[in-house]
Amino acid sequence: MKTIIAEKPSVAREIARIVGATKREEGYFEGGGYAVTWAFGHLVQLAMPDGYGIRGFVRDNLPVIPDTFTLVPRQVKTEKGYKPDSGVVTQIKTVTRLFKESEQIIVATDAGREGELIFRYLYHYTGCATPFVRLWISSLTDKAIREGLRNLEAGGKYDDLYLAAKARSESDWLVGINGTQALSIAAGHGTYSVGRVQTPTLAMVCARYWENRRFTPEAFCQLHIATDGCDEGTVKFSSSEKWKEKEPATELYNKVKSAGTATVTKAERKEKTEETPLLYDLTTLQKEANTKHGFTAEQTLEIAQKLYEKKLITYPRTGSRYIPEDVFAEIPKLLAFIGALPEWKGKVQPKAVPTRRSVDGSKVTDHHALLVTGEKPLFLSKEDNTVYQMVAGRMIEAFSEKCVKDTATVTAECAGVEFTVKGSVIRQAGWRAVYGEEDKEETAIPGWREGDTLTLKGCSITEGKTKPKPLHTEATLLSAMETAGKDIEDDALRQALKDCGIGTPATRAAIIETLFKRGYMERCKKSLVPTEKGLALYSVVKTMRIADVAMTGEWEKNLARIERGELPADTFCKEIEAYTKEITSELLSCDKLFARRDSGCKCPKCGTGSMQFYGKVVRCDNADCGLPVFRLKANRTLSDDEIKELLTDGHTKPLKGFKSKQGKSFDAIVAFDGDYNTTFVFPERKTSRKFSGRKK
């Protein structure tokens, strides 16, 4: 008998059908000489510190660096600590028996770093010695599964992939466990979760937040002139210079207005070619789904995974935007399939030769770029269909012709002031016709030449203010994670740097969600805004190595080198252990940043503890309560007296100087709600508000 192990029951069911394992047993399918079982994610994980006899957060125990990591069944948190999940334990027993009764194991977990780790951890935990081979496929269509089963690969081929996954898992454990315990011990209150990837990610969100909030707008003035354009239209020039003071701008405006004409000093015309966009990888799909449709990164990943399991798209957790030659041979057939869908009628040219910009086998790692499979997309929800059509539409774009534009840049002088205008006209829409972008308004520039005199139809002066960089959205944060914070727009260059980013396409959504779940940031429409807790953590760690984005990018680069067999995993692990010791010492030493003072106030929630000042937070010293009150509220820090008033009366007096997320100033009362969270009450509504957080 051969045992096939899949990552999920749904995938196991499809494989079982194909190999003839039609008899359903507890935890597996059987038949045709096969047993097909599943793991439903990680059945086995690294033990928590108490698995090594270390309990609680104790300074002298740090850093916790096991000589050998212990594997245990997946744990669930209970009131008495972490316990093995009973359902997981049952499934492990089933898998162990099947492994030992089999002549061969076929590994059909997801074909990637994490899928490999799921199997290898389970294999080592069970103590199994049965030989195994790898089913490595990029889609779950019947055709792909059958071809994969005919071309099984040696299990040892993916040893380096496993070593990279193992190194990632152990490094995350070392940094997360030791960093969290060290910072929490230093703080003396509460739990502050830190991590190898989550903390640098939070640092990028907080740094952008403060850059935005501390930005001082500068006023400027700009001049504009208008003259006759093409087809009875008007062409508007803008001054090359902007003036900080209105007076000189007004003087020049009057001179320009009096002049009545402008002289062309330079006229440049060029043909501009816009290359087709590359196919989607997961991160690019997530970014565009967030920008265009408001989907979260996690939502897009969940939908893409669902579409993959329905056999509609290829493997979603890919970091490549390219396909190899053998897949390119299938593209004409796939494009014909897409062209027959109602959404894309008339968008695919039947006999056109697909362009090759997205074809490069050397840039394909575990999996190629996202493609549709040719299975009909039936009965999809609105959201699922949106993501499916995004993948289909991008395929049409990627294999269409280039877009060709005629561009013009004209410079003119009037009364000593230089004005410029830029325009373009699409000559060949190419890929831009897929979404109708060729119909967007264009600026056609007449055939002016140097020395031509232009009669002014009007002139104007506008006033504006410089703007800060906007707060991060999930799309911009994903971009920053992809390039370790570097601002890079070029798609090809971003791909070249993808090994230096933080996180992987498969993990970035989970990292972002972790920051939400741990209360470090929240969504405000599309923007990501750090909470008081997130800003408090950032203020402590922002100059430390734990928050160093570039260094975290180097770790990811080294993990990719392990995967390619270019770096021994032991070398990486020794470096991570040394780093763990450094950051543990660094975080433990920051207890001075958490200096403690007694507020003199009883806890309004439990009535027994005393509220203690710890820098940016005030917290109850009763371990069973631990009520936190953050000083920073809407860009304003509450004073000691204001905090004491809040703790004593349940609310402050009306306070000035708050600033909204949109940058608008406002006055408000800070009060406790019924759950002792702080909230704003506005003075004009004070009489209708009942304060629920008064002192007991």
What are these regions (language model features)?
Residues 243-280, 286:
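Metal- or metallocofactor-binding catalytic centers and their adjacent structured scaffolds
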Residues 87, 142-227, 269-270:
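C-terminal or mid-to-C-terminal helical accessory/interaction module adjacent to the motor/catalytic core
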Residues 9-16, 33-36, 40, 59-62, ...:
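Amphipathic alpha-helical transducer elements in NTP-driven molecular machines
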Residues 2, 81-83, 125, 180, ...:
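Basic, low-complexity terminal or inter-domain segments flanking catalytic cores
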Residues 109, 287, 317:
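Short glycine-centered, acidic/aromatic-flanked micro-motifs in structured strand/loop junctions
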Residues 1-169, 173, 179, 349, ...:
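Intrinsically disordered, low-complexity regulatory segments
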